[in-house]
Amino acid sequence: VLRSLHAHAAGWTARLGYRISVYATPSESLTDRFCRLDRERFGAVPDITDKDYYTNSFHYDVRKSPTPFEKLDFEAEYARYTSGGFIHYCEYPVLQQNPKALEAVWDYAYDRVGYLGTNTPIDRCYPCGFTGDFDPTARGFACPSCGNADPRTCDVVKRTCGYLGNPQQRPMVHGRHAEI
C-alpha cells in the first residue's frame, strides 16, 4: 500500500510540478473513524475491523507484542516511502533501574531508523504515591495500586500520534484507547 501511495505521489509531483509526499503519521481520530466506517460497510472482518481500531501508520500491530528490536526491524523498510514524515516509537516498562536496556535499543536504532520516540511510563497517583504505568480501563486509566482515576489527583501521560498528552484531561478517541 505504501509503495503504491509513494508511486502515486511521485507521479503527481511529476505531472503537477508541486512536491507531493506521503505522511505516515495520520490523524489519530482516523484510526478509529476509518475502522468504524469499514466495519459498517464490510462487517466485522477478523483481525481487521473486529478490533475497533486500525494500527496507526506503518507500525507493528501491538497485539503481537514485539520486542523493540523486532518492531524496529519490521518498520524500518517503510520510512523510505513516506518522505512527508514518519515516526518510529517503542513502549517500555519502567526502566529507571535499567537504563542500559533503553540505551541498547537507541544504539540498535541509530543506523536503522530516522526518528525514534521513546515511551516509558511516568504516570503518577498523588493520593497513594504510585509512580509507573496506570491500567487502561473502559473510561480512561486508573492507578493499579489504589484504583484512583480522578484527573484532579493523578497525572497520566501517554503518547498519541507522536505527541505526549494526558488522556485523563483530554480523552483520546475510542479506537486509540482500544489499541492501548
Per-range role (PLM):
Residues V1-I180:
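Long, C-terminal-biased catalytic regions of enzyme "large/alpha" subunits
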